[in-house]
Amino acid sequence: MSHDARARLSDLRRTFHRHPEPGWREFQTTARVVEELERIGVDEIAVGREALATDARMAVPDDDEIQPWLDRARRAGVSDDLLERTAGGHTGVVATLSQGEGPCIGLRVDLDAISIHESEERDHRPEAEGFRSEHDGYMHACGHDAHLAIALGTLEAVKQSAFEGTLKVLFQPAEEISGGGKAMAESGHLDGVDYLFALHVGLDHPTGEIVAGVESPLAMAHLTATFEGASAHAGKAPNEGANAMQAAAVAIQNAYGIARHRDGATRVNVGRIEGGSASNVIAEEVTIDAEVRGETTALMTYARTELERILYAAAELHDCDVTPHVISESPCVDSHPALQEVVGNVAWGVDGVEHVIPSEEFGVSEDGTYLMQQVQDAGGLASYVLVGTDHPTSHHTPTFDIDEESLAIGVNILSETFVELSRRRP
């Protein structure tokens, strides 16, 4: 890859890094992706509602949370036409490049950022070199800025290559809240896709190390549950109330006692509780946010069913009502060995690659599995590839950063894999 091409990848990544946006509010990010696609020159660009199955969106925020981000994008110069197409939380893009007869290959990457205040320390490179987040309280702390740069670089490299076939790049919104994968999977854009790839940078793999395909991403469900009781004076007549706080506390304690399953690992966590009004008032309403995970989709469903049973039992014990609601979820889908082999063989020939791991357990959750499942259920193959990158601190921390040398490695591996698949089917 030329020096100019490497520099462009770095510039792209830094542009995305400066303008992080949370799930379903990635208006500037969507606009920048479209701008770059138009520069590259692709055959089709589907934006917003054209890129999604609207009714399948999950964890969509309220309008009053979306509107400030749309207004910010308008002030930044995003066109009224694009904002109209993405308004109401309909971000996302699908680009299609057609280059003759051959396989249809999909590449999925994610658009959104995380609610973290980025470090202002001088030894934090984005601060030192002038590309720290300009959106206070939000940051690309998981590498999605790198994913976007790699995807756009791959698309341009494939266009300039001997690739024969169709390449679809799916820029998915709302990965961090597991909200966009299902909507993009059911959009129709995966119809006819033979091979689908997703990618992630880092995850404790250094620059030059590649994982050709992950196994066992944990299936996951986010839930919220609101306990409704009756308020009363906590000193004079506590017996006249129905204590929603006590019901929630019982539910939380018992959630961690869900029996382990013989078929594999499960996880449960209650990460947030909110409710009540004063120490002398029996709490009338309390809301908790929880999640369950499982080594398989069936195990996640088991944990979710058990958690819901506990919620209802705790509510009944304290004469309360409870309304659990699944906000978002994602399945467990493994990478296909045939694609792992192709990626691994290609990676060994890419400049900068020092170590190739055929497969490893993922250990976290990822709603890109919806897209993988959609393709595999239709008879195609899918793989989730890890591109190593040196990062000074862990993902989801204020000082997270990447080694930009890994961008070119990611582009070269993916583009050369796609060319190889257009020549020889596994």
Regions inferred by a protein language model and the residue ranges of each:
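Metal-dependent amide/peptide-bond hydrolase catalytic core
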Residues: 246-426
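Histidine/acidic-residue-rich, glycine-tolerant segments that coordinate divalent metal ions
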Residues: 58-59, 93, 115-116, 127-139, ...
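Histidine-centered active-site/metal-ligand motif
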Residues: 17-19, 24, 140, 144-147, ...
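Divalent metal-coordination and catalytic microenvironments
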Residues: 16, 37, 95, 107, ...
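Short, small-residue-rich loop/turn micro-motifs
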Residues: 49, 109-111, 200, 221-231, ...
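Acidic/His- and Gly-rich active-site-bordering loop/insert found
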Residues: 2-139, 160-163
